[in-house]
Amino acid sequence: MRLTFVILLVFLTILNVLPHLSQDLSPYDTGLYHQHIVEIIKQEGLIIGSANLHDRIGFNNSNFYLVAVLEKLIPFVPGHYLLNPIVYFGTIAYLISLIFYLPHYKIAYKIIALGVIISISLHPLFIVSISPDTIAYCLSIVFIFKILLKSPGKSLHFEFLLFAILITVKFSSIFLALMFVPFFLGRNRRIYFKKLSEYIFICLFVIAPWILSNYLISGFVVYPVLQLDFLSPEWKLPLSLAQSHMETIKSWALSQGLGNAKYTNVWQYFFNWYETYSVNNIHGSFYLISLYKLMLPFLFIYVLSFLLNANRYQKLFEFVFILFLINSLWFFSAPDPRFSYATLLIFPFTIFSYSITKLFNKKSVALSKTIILLLILFSMARICFIDFGFIDKMKAPKIQTEGNWVPTKYGFMTFEPKADQCWDVSIFCNPYKNRNLKLIDGDWKKIIEL
């Protein structure tokens, strides 16, 4: 029976993954700096001050190290067909296993899992790519479900490990720290506080090496977070550049360069965002906006039910409120859906699941079987979208980057691309054509700006 389930699990997961492999959804940033970073890691491991070539190298997303390792181990398969599809496969498999294995009294979580599977199957972000966004939202989905399903008093070691990894992949995942709050304020808080030192150690064990590499690459603890600026090595990026980058990230997330990024109050901020994402389908925005419009009446019912019977729904309400808070922090910091795709999807389905379980309260077994049937039918329908043309795409030649080798004032030969995308043409690609760079060659290569 167990073997049969494993075969079914793998089969359904494959049906949900295969349709995406023929779609190269690599974002523009892959050519801009993603592939450049991977090439640096493969050839040198790390170049001190390499962010002086391109400041976005300073983001130092840890997934690029994994991509580099996989490309070394499996050189005949392009990197964008390796890490992200594997992580996406694992996430879908995990959600499917929840639908099959969770007991009937946890039917609400099965509904949420089904909603998320359908959502990320129909509206994926960068599956065939090396973008950190994919692994960030996939691992965030797993993290949130592990938190929601955690039994009172049980250890949080794995969840803190996953959280620490997420921080190194995408620093915007820092908001997920709020998911731990109910554990440290609830009835079992003494149990969790006793193990707090262990949780902190796990986080430091993962994050400390990443912070060190951040420092060596850009001179910042976390680039471009200005609040963590207290180091000044000779290779450090200018503070003004970091400040400008933060402003660019927020304004671009608000308008995508298509709408108005200027605002004077909260309402104008909201309307600027809505004007951008309701007219342009950016990172699944059409789907998300429709989902939230549909959710509004259910949200009203949910809040009203909680007020009438707070004790019964306290645990679920705590996490619903935290998801709402995380989404609010996302909205007022950098409101591009790709920065918090997991919480943006899980929040409305949590509200929907409550309403559905209230309606079918006495038929949870039948509802559970219905959810499994819907999962199987949806997965089978995905067969129509499978295109094995991705096999030929995997054999396609590398993108040729046009440009010239030009020396800087200090004799440092860098490659200046005709456009601004470096891809993997050279580890010394210089898209900003900065002629003030100097290379100090030694056991560790170092790039400084004079």
Residues of each region from the PLM?
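Hydrophobic, aromatic-rich transmembrane alpha-helices
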Residues: 87-103, 268-313
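Membrane-interface alpha helices of multi-pass inner-membrane proteins
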Residues: 124, 156-182, 202-205, 219, ...
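Membrane-embedded helix bundles of polyisoprenyl
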Residues: 12-13, 88-98, 102, 106-147, ...
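Intrinsically disordered, polar/acidic, low-complexity terminal segments
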Residues: 231-267, 271, 367-450
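Start-transfer (signal-anchor) and selected internal transmembrane alpha helices
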Residues: 1-17, 191-202
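Perimembrane helix-loop-helix junctions
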Residues: 176-204, 350, 356-358
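Membrane-lumen/periplasm interface segments of specific transmembrane helices
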Residues: 23, 66, 196-283, 385
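Active-site lumenal/periplasmic loops and adjacent helix-entry segments of GT-C-fold
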Residues: 16-107, 127-129
